[in-house]
Amino acid sequence: MLVKKIAMILAVTLLALGCAKKFDAPKLADFSLKVFKVGSSKGPLMLYVQNSENEYKFSLVNALGAPEARRVLKDGTFANLGFLPPNSAYNELFVKVLEMIKDEKNEQKFMIDDQIYEVKSVDIR
């Protein structure tokens, strides 16, 4: 009976892992850091994007500097950096910002899960 329960839990876990959403990250020229101001219903946010060794690291912080999301995108899959809970809307936002970088756009609005995000590139040179 115990073996049957363990097998069932393992099967459900493997099924859930197999259903993880994959993202197609655009191919970008190397860059060390890009910074964006993000307007949302949560107030002003800052997004920091780093490109290193075939992975993209995203840090989204609020006006007080507290992290809202810290994620890494590698091989089409997001993983947490730290202990913040995953947020699928932020994952989609991060991929859209990568597309914005690829298309060399400085400003764009996105609608994700009934939430409007206004993203503007910040020049930190």
Language model feature labels by segment:
Residues K4-I9:
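Sec-dependent signal peptide recognition
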Residues A16-G18:
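C-terminal motif of bacterial Sec signal peptides marking the signal peptidase cleavage site
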Residues A20-K22:
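Bacterial signal peptide processing site
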Residues D24-L33:
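Short, low-complexity, disordered segments immediately C-terminal to signal peptides
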Residues K37-R71:
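Post-signal-peptide N-terminal segment of Sec-exported extracytoplasmic proteins
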Residues Q50-E55, V72-T77, K105, V122-R125:
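Short, solvent-exposed coil/turn segments at beta-strand boundaries
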Residues L60-L64, L73-T77, G82-P86, D123:
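A mature extracytoplasmic/lumenal domain signature
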Residues L84-R125:
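C-terminal low-complexity, charged extensions that often adopt amphipathic alpha-helices
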